[in-house]
Amino acid sequence: VTNIFKVFLIVCAILVMLGGIIVIGLGGTVNQGIGSALAGGEIKERDITAFAELGERELGRRLIEGGDYALAIGIYAMISGIAIILLALVLHFVSRIFKDFMESYSPFQPGILKNLKIALILIVVYTAQSGLGIAVVTAMAAWCVINIFEYGCELQRQSDETL
């Protein structure tokens, strides 16, 4: 099931990023269409403000205020595609962790720790798109979990040596 979902996420990411590239490529037509729809009242200004929420919020706002709607939408799609790829990678490493849990006599193994570190780093990177504050809190929690698992691996190694 997780493999199917990973493939689905990757396909979605590719389609979203491809759509962003197409929108950027058709920039003149898209900008003209959205501009006339705004002028005609068919689209409200608040309907397109979501695209102003790019990684650098000032950039998205400047693009929309300057009438470059296609570039704002395209960048938004590219960032969304990258976020979906990050989710697929997190799912991949988390599924490897649980697979190793099932096959191992102890969760405190170096391979599990390595996959856990990678998954937690990807989660911190993913949360950074929501804001720096939540990313810092997530990073501190991830650091605590990693330290607990490192200590558990050390205790497991000592236990294995005494047997």
Predicted regions and their residues:
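Alpha-helical transmembrane segments of integral membrane proteins
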Residues: K6-C12, M78-L86, K117-L120, G133, ...
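Transmembrane alpha-helical segments in integral membrane proteins
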Residues: G20, G25-G28, D68-K99, M140-W143
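Alpha-helical membrane-spanning segments of integral membrane proteins, especially the hydrophobic core
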Residues: E65-G81, P110-Y126
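Membrane-helix boundary elements
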Residues: I43-S80
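Alpha-helical transmembrane segments of multi-pass integral membrane proteins
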Residues: K114-L163
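Membrane-helix boundary/juxtamembrane motif in polytopic membrane proteins
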Residues: R96-L120, E161-T162
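Cytosolic juxtamembrane helix and N-cap/initiation of the first transmembrane helix
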Residues: V1-G40
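Perimembrane helix-loop junctions in membrane proteins
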Residues: V23-A37, D100-S104, Y151-E161
